[in-house]
Amino acid sequence: MGGVFASEVPVGALAAQTLQNVRRQYETLFQDDAVKSAFAFLVKFAHACRSEDPREALKASGISMAEKATLLSIVRTLKDQIPQQQAATEYGQLTIGAAADAIGHWYKQNASQQMPLFKPSSEFLDSWRPLGNGSGFCELSRLFFGKVTERYLNYFLERAASATCPSLEHRERFQEGIRSHVDAVSQHAFETAKITQSFAAG
């Protein structure tokens, strides 16, 4: 990353500041109410997928799901489960976006049959059944925290770049240049979690 516009902006300083900010955020992640609310929804959602009637299981957990759900309606239900005071913060928005991304990515890769994005479907149970097993939930969890990492990195990089880059043009060029590095870090975090799980299972 040192070669990305190093002559124009202090890349090393930006990277160090960004990593410090992300590290500080992760040290208190367990205290973040939005993260706890979003993850609680993922847990309840996955657990409901083990039930014969997922909607009733969700209802018993205080979550109302449309009888004929769409992927977007599930994401809306997620957002409804985050209290307004948590969702209103910048970190809250990052968390909600990460959870929505994780749900969409997991569904695209794992759902037993694809449910329409907009058109209501009665195949909720069959489509999401794989989420109810251990491996399905573990993958969703890894996706969630990987997406949280990715969004934190982008957020803090943009803040650091805004304060350091000499012009809007330089900032845009820098952000474009480091985007691939952010993606690589997020993928590394995801793969590390998979390796850790494999060793734990062994």
What are these regions (language model features)?
Residues F137, F145-G146, E150-G202:
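Membrane-interacting alpha-helical segments
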Residues Q84-A87, Y91, T95, N133-S141, ...:
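Non-transmembrane, amphipathic alpha-helical segments
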Residues M1-I96, A102:
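Extended, helix-rich scaffolding/adaptor regions
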Residues Q109-F118, S122, I195-G202:
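Eukaryotic scaffold/interaction segments
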Residues A66-I74, K119-F124, N154:
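Helix-boundary capping/turn motifs
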Residues S122-N133:
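Short, charged/polar, low-complexity loop and linker segments
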Residues F5-P10, T18, G132, G136, ...:
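Solvent-exposed aromatic/hydrophobic patches embedded in short alpha-helical segments
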Residues K79-P83, A87, A98-S112, P116, ...:
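Solvent-exposed flexible segments
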